[in-house]
Amino acid sequence: MYATQALLPTLTTELAVSPSTAALTVSAATGALALCVVPASILSEKYGRGRVLVISALGATTLGLALPLAQTAGQLIALRAAQGALIAGTPAVAMTWLSEELDPRDLPGAMGLYIAGNSIGGLSGRLIPAGLLEVTSWRWAMFGSALVAFTLAALAAWALP
């Protein structure tokens, strides 16, 4: 979700855009997520929480693998908006699903783990591409970050009930 934040100075140079245009790679994803959380929640009522969660996580991370192929800033921003829309199903479903499936006594600890995991994901989503950028291009940094995210999403999809 935040991989491009670590790459903003490089994106500005490599894509020959202003810093504010490069920043749209972050804003487009977070804005689309915000707009799509409620619709994703409604979809989870109709099609099932697990299905929406898996489609959301695998869809967003699969799209992340394609991000390095963007040739222009406009393409990258559009793909990031689509990625944000796809990932909206994850927060829309996760907390509700936990509250439905767990004993109320176990819920606070589970919610704490969810929030901690979300924070770790946000941090690693910045650190992984930043570290990779030290030894490779922004495209490979994005791909490496997306590959880690896809692997974890696939593992989660496999482990979910």
What is each stretch, according to the model?
Residues 10, 41-42, 131:
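Membrane-interface helix termini in secondary transporters
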Residues 63, 74-83:
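Paired small-residue
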